[in-house]
Amino acid sequence: VRNISAQGRRGHLRFGISPWEMCEIRDFGDVPLPEANNNEQCIERITEFYDVIAESGVRPVSIGGDHSITGGILQAIAGPKSKLTNGEKAVLVHFDAHTDAFHQLDHFLGAVKSAAHWASYLVRDGFVDASKSIQVGIRGNTRTLDWLDSSYELGYEIITKDQYDEYGVEKCIEMIQERVGDAPIYITFDLDCLDVTVAPGVSNL
């Protein structure tokens, strides 16, 4: 990402915007993860890193990692102690092939705060308001046919990939806007939301 950014193509001709002129942008570097094989510790390290960012009032854009990093980030920048959301819960606009709300699983590869759990525990722990959040692009093969139930139980709205194809872009945008309203929004995007012909290197399909 940094190598591509360094090419200096900073304007978007189609949208007619230049983000580097609209905003003050800084690269804060990588989150140090000395316990890289310990998922639970890594999540807390991410939270510690983002606590400093949130305290300063800076709005972060985060790239990299698997989707479990969202848990660490939102523990810092949303919820009752957050300056960025004025103490409110965040509302998710979540693009993904999976809901990542599988709280019926005791763990995923030994981790509880995992890429399969973050959309659940963030609701349970008071950082995300599922009643105003929406998950878009859900698709793929499943282990069980009730795999969306856990997300619905939490209060999320879901637009599956089939529904997205049926509704079209404009209607989906309207649904998202109606759902989230004027609540503080956190947008998160998993590459496996894209078709495999576009992102063939994504491991979790």
What is the role of each PLM region?
Residues 2-205:
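Conserved alpha-helical scaffold segments that buttress catalytic/binding sites
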